[in-house]
Amino acid sequence: MVALSPSYRDGALSALAAREVDVLVIGGGVVGAGCALDAVTRGLTVGLVEARDLASGTSSRSSKLIHGGLRYLEMLDFALVREALRERDLILQRLAPHLARPVRFLYPLQHRGWERLYAGAGVTLYDTLARRGSLPRHRHLSRRGAMRACPSLRRDALIGALQYYDAQIDDARHTMFLARTAAAYGAHVATRLEVTGFLREGSRMTGVRVDDLEHDRTFEIRARQIVNATGVWTDDTQSLVGERGQFHVRASKGIHLVVPRDRIQSSTGLILRTASSVLFVIPWGRHWIIGTTDTDWRLDKAHPAASAKDIDYLLTEVNKVLATPLERADVEGVYAGLRPLLSGESESTSKLSREHSVVSPVPGLVVVAGGKYTTYRVMAKDAIDACVHNLARNVPRSVTDRIPLLGADGFPALWNRRGLLAAESGLHVARVEHLLGRYGSLVHDLLALIREDPDLGRPIEGAEDYLRAEFVHAAAAEGARHLVDVLTRRTRISIETFDRGVVAAPHAAELMGRVLGWTPSQREREVENYRLRVEAERASQEQQDDETADAARLGAPEVVPIRVS
């Protein structure tokens, strides 16, 4: 089994520097990782380069829903909803059943008569567009039935409700598994490689120049086709080409709050109507995720900041339906992400296109942008189709609708055997369920680590939901190069603990350092860098507007590379 280990990265760099690849993908988000998997499973030679970490941008900061998007039905975008629902069902049933799971939602109704008919017709159409039998169909609930499912609702906030199902996924882990699966099929995947320029022969793009941010060196990568899959950085990447793009990407900021599960008594998620969009209250393990906002963002793209105004808006909206209002002190975590929207005529980002676009502005280069997280596979397929057309040779069609990700194979059987796995490993069955939901059939790799060192079977200090083995595994197999990679993406400690992961940080650094060969001073540097990041984020969340929040967030240093000579 291919692991995204330090030695794997060294080999990937050597391979990329030594020979031309058929397709080079720029961007390690969900679309870029999807492009790499699509291309390599067609029999092409593939490289993927990412300037920071896998899923370090938008792909770790979504609402973590795999869904069709009920609000797009109101926009009469039936094709987008149908496509997204088809992809949702593929992910749930075939591609990543270990990472995705159904989630139930209530939509409270506030008006008698017309609203139940109107909303009911919409959810009926939503169910109809989905594949029959993939998830339970919607139900109408009385006020009593809705209050039974969600006792925390204010009685005067609803006259009844609709219940329907969608799905959720840990977006960052899903993206990492996409990249790791691509590597298992032969793609060369390397993070901390920043593209600084394009190579050109005449009018044709023939490769890129990259800076290795870990080793402080520069080299060139040659490719027959290059895919720009850099999301909100699409225009920035295109500027390196020196050619005007055929479309532009605007960033829309969406923030989310995380609160403990006991703050809202409910067995179901909520979807609430707001003046401009919808608001989700999403079950997330022992927590709730509340979001999102939809506002234009023209500041730092690497570290979008949530302001106090953003946070207060979400609390105000959700408190309209809660019997016991949430307060700022209830908020464990806050995260902000940027949606890459194709520019349109409207000034409102909520009305910009969620469709995706694929173009080839110059020979040798394909650009893919826009879209939704759920439809990443279709975006990747379309981008690689364009590459194949430009390669002008016979290449098989996409097969990613039939390629389960690593960890998916045998997952249902392992889930049924979770009690036996618990007995064999000495772990509580709840721990085994946690591991299965994060690693699937790769759980055996974690259990092997614990057999070799039983101390790794203990929870990490400061974040008891996670075992110490997970931090060793993240550095050894999941491509984590820095402490922030593990605390914010391989795990979600940064948003699931009130201290934002500061207590767990030194313990995580010690475990990662065993794999990555960190000296005591290097460990201290990683921990201090993470502490400053948390301080800067907290400071930004006290500011009243985007500009001051952005300035406060930029007070933290970037990742301190572990330089290797």
Describe these PLM feature segments.
Residues 1-23, 38-42:
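Extreme N-terminal leader/targeting segments of oxidoreductases
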Residues 28-29, 51:
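Glycine-rich Rossmann-fold phosphate-binding loop(s) that bind the pyrophosphate
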Residues 26, 221-231:
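Short hydrophobic core segments
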Residues 20, 52, 98, 111-122, ...:
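C-terminal accessory subdomains/tails of enzymes that are appended
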